Amino acid sequence: MTTRIDAFRTETTAIDGLHVIRMKQIHDERGTIREFFRASAMTDAGLHPGPWRQLNLTETSHGAVRGLHGEAMTKLVSVVQGSVFGAYVDARPNSPTVGAVVTVEIEVGTQVLVPQGVCNGFQSTSDGVSQYLYCFDEEWRPGMSGVGITPLDPRLAIKWPIPIDAANRGQLSQKDLDAPTLASVLASLGN
């Protein structure tokens, strides 16, 4: 039996505190084992190890967009089925990378650690449904502080891989369409 091991590794990005994580994976003739989370590996890499207090799983159809949302919680996000185009925007007014945009192709085996205040959004690129898993270090509650930014903000210049029809509620929610631009969010925060 031939075994191949892909080691746990992390990549820094243009947003302070946003990291792309490649899971440890063990492949053989039977299939693959993915080490979804190991606190000691996160700590050894200098990353936030949780604890995770809430897990959400979304099922999202081909071409649909969710986000951009930035709450007062750190998120570890991943795909457990399918693939997505992830988009991240630093909306933290005191961040050294405020306004930076990072995009990541996320497939099974890839995670993104999203610091609190960084907006997270994605578009499903799978032919079928993508399952996107969120791990939160705080429980979401109504009235929780945070911001939303429209994924169609032209100044962000996000190149969504599947064209977005702003009139199609099956592709983009009214709430996300009506969200403010990053410039409006930063102005409201006094920046």
Locate each region found by the language model.
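Conserved metal-binding segment of the jelly-roll/cupin
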Residues: 105-127
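Non-catalytic, conserved peripheral segments adjacent to functional cores
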Residues: 1-106, 127-130, 136-144, 148-191
